């Protein structure tokens, strides 16, 4: 069993620890800048023990909602989908026109996940991870699946 709650209802140290454990730091670096995920709006999936088992963060800027991070600790249980739906609803209520997000070329699971949920390729930024790596040198060169981490892929979805 899980419940979805806004990140601002969770002790900040729990969010900081979650991102540090899964990303090495609460900072998310993409070519457009560095974001402190533990300080962003978002939602967390929490199990019956109060442990965070998934988290999504986002920003809203005018008519755009940008998802900065989405993590699910247990695959294929609907956690990522439930979190994504929460942000999509929030974006609708904020009168956003689209939701966008960036992932990297090595993240084949995320690429499939977003396409199955109606997100489309909007752009590919070759070698963009080099810029992000200058901001956050901890970004590895090669993913666990053996793919070089090199390009950023922008996905977007128009909000009805």
UniProtKB/Swiss-Prot annotation:
Coiled coil: none
Annotated TM spans: none
GO molecular function, one term: acyltransferase activity, transferring groups other than amino-acyl groups
Source domain of life: Bacteria
Domain N-acetyltransferase as annotated: residue spans: 2-140
Name by which UniProt lists this protein: Uncharacterized protein YdhI
Organism taxonomic ancestry: Bacteria, Bacillati, Bacillota, Bacilli, Bacillales
Gene: ydhI
């Amino acid at each position: 069993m899980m419940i979805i709650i806004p990140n601002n209802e969770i002790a900040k140290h729990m969010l900081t620890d979650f991102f540090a454990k899964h990303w090495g730091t609460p900072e998310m670096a993409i070519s457009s800048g560095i974001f402190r995920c533990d300080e962003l709006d978002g939602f967390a999936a929490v199990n019956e023990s109060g442990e965070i088992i998934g988290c999504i963060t986002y920003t809203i800027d005018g008519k755009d909602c940008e998802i900065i991070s989405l993590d699910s600790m247990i695959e294929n249980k609907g956690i990522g989908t439930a979190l994504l739906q929460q942000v999509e609803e929030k974006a609708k209520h904020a009168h956003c026109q689209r939701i966008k997000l960036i992932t990297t070329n090595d993240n084949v699971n995320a690429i499939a996940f977003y396409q199955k949920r109606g997100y489309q390729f909007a752009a590919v930024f070759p070698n963009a991870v080099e810029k992000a790596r200058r901001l956050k040198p901890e970004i590895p060169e090669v993913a666990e699946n053996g793919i070089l981490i090199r390009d950023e892929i922008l996905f977007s979805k128009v909000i009805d």
